[in-house]
């Protein structure tokens, strides 16, 4: 698929989803089953409005069935499922209608809170609709088929995805709301993060831990918190706080490295460096608030990391405990303002060299 976009100065190629692959393979197999004609390509429409022409692979057939595959192309997105072949076996069945099942390498949902009910194959609603719509285009009137989607290698690849955390076992999910993979899509990551919250909420949890990365997650686990209650949100703290309110959570522990959380102290809730990288400026402003001289402020402004800035601040005679507490208090205040005081929030501020350097907010009892 040779369609591109430009992001952060880089030319990136679009791909197509496992849902598009499943729909295309199902349409191709159905067409070949009823016409007896072998085809090399198949055309489908996607919810995004793009028309795809995809290569049909590994065609096999027998009495009353045809099976074929479509290779997943994730474009320039870092997608674990890129290169997998999504197969569809289409069999004649008595009566009319289309029945869709999951086979080898397609996960099974085990927990509530997902778009698919527990016990069902992890074929999301939009891909399921795509499969049905594309097959109907080539299914003769009055005929019925049984469709089985399979993904050889899917069970192994699924371990590299969110599925284990989401309670989807045995394989990958057949996904895609648009049919198209947008490279480096923020929306795809946000959707995955929201699913984690959705599952915890469906299980009755009211308390959750948010960590921007591994430092916060590792710290929370050392504190004895259950790993599945810890969500690594990356850069999307604002989004996750909003969703925590939406899903009825009452308590959030925010545990993270000062390099991420100092941005939150200044009211920055998307902490990606391309959105806002003002760490040095924020710390310089705060150390000036603590009475540091211009030389110290300049050194902090020139620092490469927040850890280096802390060293500079400490050498200048500023009480690091008080300074860190000031930051933690502001993180807490900004988060409370962001959710209009609808969550109880506890902040744990971490330094690589110093460990936990400050806590603020309401103590969350587990």
Curated annotation (Swiss-Prot):
Pathway: Cofactor biosynthesis; adenosylcobalamin biosynthesis; cob(II)yrinate a,c-diamide from sirohydrochlorin (anaerobic route): step 6/10
Record's keyword annotation contains Cell membrane: no
Taxonomic superkingdom: Bacteria
Enzyme class: transferase
Protein keywords: Cobalamin biosynthesis, Methyltransferase, S-adenosyl-L-methionine, Transferase
GO process terms (BP): anaerobic cobalamin biosynthetic process; methylation
Entry keyword annotation includes Transferase: yes
Enzyme Commission number, as recorded: 2.1.1.195
Reactions catalysed according to its record: Co-precorrin-5B + S-adenosyl-L-methionine = Co-precorrin-6A + S-adenosyl-L-homocysteine
Any Pfam family the entry gives: CbiD
Record-level Gene Ontology MF annotations: cobalt-precorrin-5B C1-methyltransferase activity
Database matches in NCBIfam families: cbiD, PRK00075.1-1
Family, per entry: Belongs to the CbiD family.
HAMAP family registered for this protein in UniProt: CbiD (MF_00787)
Protein name: Cobalt-precorrin-5B C(1)-methyltransferase
Lineage of producing organism: Bacteria, Bacillati, Bacillota, Clostridia, Thermoanaerobacterales
């Amino acid at each position: 698929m040779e369609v591109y976009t430009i992001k952060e100065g880089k030319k990136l190629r679009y791909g197509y989803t496992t849902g598009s692959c499943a729909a295309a393979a199902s349409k191709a197999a159905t067409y070949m089953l009823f016409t007896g004609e072998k085809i090399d390509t198949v055309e489908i429409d996607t919810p995004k409005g793009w028309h795809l022409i995809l290569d049909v692979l590994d065609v096999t057939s027998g009495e009353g069935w045809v099976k074929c595959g479509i290779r997943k192309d994730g474009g320039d997105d870092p997608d674990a499922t890129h290169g997998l072949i999504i197969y569809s076996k289409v069999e004649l069945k008595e009566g009319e209608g289309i029945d869709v099942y999951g086979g080898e390498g397609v996960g099974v949902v085990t927990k509530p809170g997902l778009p698919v009910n527990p016990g069902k194959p992890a074929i999301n609603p939009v891909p399921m609709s795509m499969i049905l719509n594309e097959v109907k285009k080539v299914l003769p009137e009055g005929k019925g088929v049984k469709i089985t989607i399979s993904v050889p290698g899917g069970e192994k690849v699924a371990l590299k995805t969110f599925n284990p955390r989401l309670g989807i076992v045995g394989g990958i999910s057949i996904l895609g709301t648009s049919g198209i993979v947008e490279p480096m899509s923020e929306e795809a990551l946000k959707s995955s993060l929201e699913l984690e919250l959705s599952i915890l909420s469906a299980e009755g949890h009211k308390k959750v831990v948010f960590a921007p990365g591994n430092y916060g997650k590792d710290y929370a686990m050392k504190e004895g918190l259950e790993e599945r209650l810890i969500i690594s949100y990356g850069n999307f703290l604002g989004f996750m706080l909003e969703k925590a309110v939406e899903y009825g959570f009452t308590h959030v522990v925010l545990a993270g490295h000062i390099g991420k959380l100092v941005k939150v102290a200044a009211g920055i809730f998307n902490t990606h460096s391309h959105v806002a990288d003002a760490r040095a400026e924020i710390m310089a402003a705060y150390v000036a608030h603590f009475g540091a001289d211009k030389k110290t402020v300049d050194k902090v402004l020139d620092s490469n990391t927040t850890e280096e800035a802390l060293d500079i601040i400490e050498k200048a005679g500023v009480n690091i405990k008080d300074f860190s507490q000031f930051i933690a208090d502001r993180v807490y205040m900004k988060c409370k303002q962001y959710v209009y005081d609808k969550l109880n929030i506890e902040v744990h501020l971490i330094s690589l060299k110093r460990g936990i350097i400050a806590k603020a907010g309401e103590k969350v009892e587990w």
